[in-house]
């Protein structure tokens, strides 16, 4: 159940990435230039994902992206988006608020998963090490 919820969070981040890019393109339709920022959703390992902002550069060699440093916590600092102009900046801030919530929920989910796995291991060890006697072997006077 915990892993299913985590998968849903990752899928939501991917949907937000795609939706953001489409909305950003719509804002740029009458303007010269390109969308200078995007959302990247990566899966560094089987049980994790990361949603972060990237700066997009266009050069003679083609397109390149650079990760924007978030620092600690779940939210990007306001100054991280100083290169983005309005009205795109407003869209970025709105999406960042939602992405920060997703990052926090994902982190809490992984912490809960880790705790549940540790508890499962502990209970499994204790059950396998315990020497339970059959209730039939308990003397009558000891049953309460």
Show where each model-derived region lies.
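Conserved glycine(s) in the ABC-transporter nucleotide-binding domain "signature"
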Residues: 1-144
């Amino acid at each position: 159940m915990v892993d299913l919820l985590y998968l849903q969070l990752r899928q939501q981040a991917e949907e937000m990435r795609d939706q953001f890019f489409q909305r950003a393109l719509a804002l740029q339709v009458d303007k010269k230039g390109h969308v200078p920022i995007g959302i990247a959703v990566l899966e560094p390992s089987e049980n994790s994902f990361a949603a972060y902002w990237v700066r997009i550069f266009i050069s003679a060699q083609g397109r390149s992206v650079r990760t924007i440093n978030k620092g600690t916590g779940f939210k990007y600092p306001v100054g991280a988006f100083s290169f983005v102009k309005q009205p795109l900046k407003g869209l970025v801030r709105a999406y960042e608020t939602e992405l920060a919530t997703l990052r926090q929920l994902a982190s809490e989910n992984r912490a809960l998963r880790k705790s549940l796995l540790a508890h499962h291991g502990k209970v499994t060890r204790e059950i396998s090490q315990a020497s339970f006697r059959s209730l039939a072997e308990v003397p009558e006077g000891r049953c309460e």
